[in-house]
Structures are given as structure tokens and as C-alpha cells.
């Protein structure tokens, strides 16, 4: 089982590494917004910590919905390129339409930007669809779309507030995916 821990700074990445995390997801403003795109410098610094499977970088310009204006889409595509250039082992991205489906043209552009920058940097990167997945109306059709777009994994709580409540759905998604894409259970934990 791969353990990925969301962090928002170098200290968090170091602690995650020391405690045995396989990889980290780097986000800014994690607790206030659910995570935003971190700075180029923060990505570089965290990429040097030595986490075995590296740093996955959340690309998200603001909190709130995952329906983005054209200007926000442009920013995210540029941020994907910058994150890979800064040393990210992958990016965590996504967008949806007002009617609860994946924004396919935008999501394709994000994945292509990541792969193109990876080629330019002469390394492989992973592309993950973030928890906007839990808000999609037809998650099985969404999995087919993400597989077609070449995504590595999808983050989901199974549509529940916490993973244990979503275990049944996680099992269904995993069976449907049948190894074509990784279903990664995720949750938000805050210490008491």
C-alpha cells in the first residue's frame, strides 16, 4: 500500500518522509481552502527532501468550486508546466462543468501540459485527478474518460465525508477500474 500525505511546506515534507510516507502531495493553504497551488520555490525545496516517490503538486488557483473561468484555466496550465520544471514528480489537477461532468477539453490540456513538460525535462511524471471526482455525477463514465486521457490515478473518498463511510463505493470504483487507473482513497484529517 502506498502512503501519500498532504503537506504544505518543507517541514511537513520532511516529517512525512521521516514517518515513512511514500510520496507527498504539496498544497498551499491546505486547511483554509482544501489546498491551492504552492509556489515554485516551495515545490523545488520539497522536491529535494528525498521522499521516495517524490512530490505530487496540487494545481488549483482558488478555493470553492472546480468549475473554472478561461483565465483560471490558462493559469493552471502554466502552473502545471512550472510545477514539473520545479521538480514535481506529478501534478494533481481537475476541472468540471456546471452540469457535473469532467471538463474534458480543459482536463486534456492539463494532462498534455504535464506530459509535454516531462518530455522537455527528460523524466516521467504522474497525473492525478483530484477530489473534484467526488462531485461528479457519473463516476464510472468519469473513470473511462480519465483512463482515455492517460491519468495515473484519481483521489476519492468514495463520495463520503470520510473514507470509512465510502468504502463500498471505493470498492466498486476499484473493481470497475480493474487496474487501468489507480483509485487512491483519501481523506482530510485534522489533529484534535
Predicted regions and their residues:
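Active-site mouth loops of central-metabolism enzymes
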Residues: 1-8, 61-75, 129-137
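Active-site-adjacent beta->alpha loops and helix N-cap segments on the catalytic face
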Residues: 31-49, 98-113, 136-141, 161-174
